Structure formats: structure tokens, C-alpha cells
Amino acid sequence: MSKLRIPILLVLFIVSCCSAEQCGTQAGGALCPGGLCCSKFGWCGSTSEYCGDGCQSQCSGSSGGGTLSSLISGDTFNNMLKHRNDNACQGKPFYTYDAFLSAAKAFPNFANKGDTATKKREIAAFLGQTSHETTGGWPTAPDGPYAWGYCFLREQNPSTYCQASSEFPCASGKQYYGRGPIQISWNYNYGQCGRAIGVDLLNNPDLVATDPVISFKTALWFWMTPQSPKPSCHDVITGGWTPSSADRAAGRLPGYGTVTNIINGGLECGRGQDSRVQDRIGFYKRYCDIFGIGYGDNLDCYSQRPFGSSLPLSSILLDTVAAA
């Protein structure tokens, strides 16, 4: 078999020189059809050259979901998102456990790296961040504010979120406001995500609010896909990201706080104490407690410079104090 390896790799190299990549970071986070593995070079296949070292997605084939259901049961899911089907919640009864598992089959690396505690910590982090994005809780809410995640489905009082783009042009009459667990917004995000999961979200953005599996897929796509200069949320929370010297100088270290920075750092991070960051942490801690696992280090981003920001951290903090 070793004699065949060189020709196969040579073919991969030749193909890569002559056509566009098919998947992974080289193709905007696109997944391979039929559950095929995405190689480190951005090509789809099922052999060890594709599924082995450096594989980017679907590295175990199209199984997915099974491992996830052994980590979080339907009862645990319902306990975490305890009031999502309350009559006061806009999202009732949209967000289901089965839709979550079904969507995760397209992202088999989700909650599938490291020991059991690491896998559960990723689930807690994902549900914690998305619960904040969709929360219907308030300080004196029944069972506390962190039992009200996944209450909302669509952004309240939305804008159109349309930015001129030749690659992902806005469709006539369509709005790209926040929808679903991660509240995906802007035409370029709908376009990239739709391309990756194989759905035309530019022309049909409301699928994110009408099809629960697609809705969860958009959130998982965002979670699993790095977008330079940001790493993926998945890599950060599972220990797969090593901060550069620039990251360390900006206060960005492995942990839940950097996940918050990836999602909304421009508005929430590097500004000292922030109630939104506290809310994200509150959901995360509750879910970790339900799982019976530790929280890890670096939970907040109060002293982190947002990704892509060239301002000194002290300037961000000073601006915040001056505005207070």
C-alpha cells in the first residue's frame, strides 16, 4: 500500500493546481457531499489521504449525531433549555432535540474531540452562547434567567442587514436579520453559510426560521468554521487553538472568553465589566453544572482586545470609562 501513496498524493497535487478546492477553509467552510472527508488541502474523498492527518471536516464519514446523543440526552437538553417552549417564547416549539442531533450529523467533529469532559464542555459552550443570543430571561424569571435560552427565533426590531457584495448579493425584497440559535445576520454570512450547507439562503433566508435542522446547521457552521483572523469557536473551546504572540498581547487566551470575542468581541470585549458577557457566562456555568464538569479558565473577555482591532487595549478601556 505504501507504493500507492505517492501516486495518490501526486494526483491530489495535480488536481489542486488545475481547479478550485471543494471544501474546508479553502472553499468558505463548505462540506463535502455524501459525508465525504475534507482533506487538509480542501478536497473531498474517503481514503486516508482525505480522512487522515489534517482532515478538516466529516473525518469519520457521515455518522455524526450518535456520539452526541450519548453525551447529552433529550432530558438533559430539555432541562438546560427549560423554558424554550413557554407560551411567552416566540420560538415555541421550534428548537427540538431531534433537530439538534440531525444538524450535528453534518458536523461530526462537534463535541467529538478530547475526553468526555471536553466534549461536554463544548456542548455547554455552544448552548451557552446561543442561549444568550436567543434568551427570553430576566433577573427574576422563574428558575432564574439562565433557564430561558432558545426563547426567541427572530431578531426583534431588525434592520435589513444588506451590504453591497458581488459574491453574495442581496436578493430583492429579502432581509438578512438575525435568525436561529446564533442569530446569523448579514447577506455575506447567509451566503457563505448557505454555500457550505448546500442551501440557497440568500434567496431563502427565512429557512433559518422555518426549518429547525437548517437553523441548527447555521449555528454549527458558524461554530465550526474559522474566519480569519478569528479561529473557530470549536478549536478554542476544545484546546485546538494556540494563541499567537499577538493574541497573547491582546489578552486572547484559550477559554470561553475568547469564544465570546469571536462571536461579538467588537461590541462586548476589551471594555471592562459588561452585562452581556456576564449573561453568556451565566448560561455556560449553568450548563456545565448540569453536566457536572469544570468551567475551564479565562471565562470573560473584559480585558481582551477584539479580533482585528489595532487599538491598544488601554485605549479601548479608557474610551469606555470616558463614555460611562
Swiss-Prot record:
Gene Ontology biological process terms, A to Z: cell wall macromolecule catabolic process; chitin catabolic process; defense response to fungus; polysaccharide catabolic process
Superkingdom of the source species: Eukaryota
InterPro entries in the record: Chitin-bd_1, Chitin-binding_1_CS, Endochitinase-like_sf, Glyco_hydro_19, Glyco_hydro_19_cat, Lysozyme-like_dom_sf
Active site as annotated: 133 (proton donor)
GO molecular function: chitin binding; endochitinase activity
Propeptide regions on this chain: 310-324
Signal peptide: 1-20
Coiled-coil blocks: none
Keywords associated with the record: Carbohydrate metabolism, Chitin degradation, Chitin-binding, Disulfide bond, Glycosidase, Hydrolase, Plant defense, Polysaccharide degradation, Signal
Cysteines engaged in disulfide bonds, as pairs: 23-38, 32-44, 37-51, 55-59, 151-170, 269-301
Reaction(s) the record says it catalyses: Random endo-hydrolysis of N-acetyl-beta-D-glucosaminide (1->4)-beta-linkages in chitin and chitodextrins
EC number: 3.2.1.14
Residues of the Chitin-binding type-1 domain: 21-61
Induction: By infection with the fungal pathogen Ascochyta pisi.
Family: Belongs to the glycosyl hydrolase 19 family. Chitinase class I subfamily.
Primary role: Defense against chitin-containing fungal pathogens.
Matching PANTHER family: CHITINASE 12, CHITINASE-RELATED
Name of the protein described by the UniProt record: Endochitinase A2
Source organism of the structure: Pisum sativum
Gene for this chain: CHI2
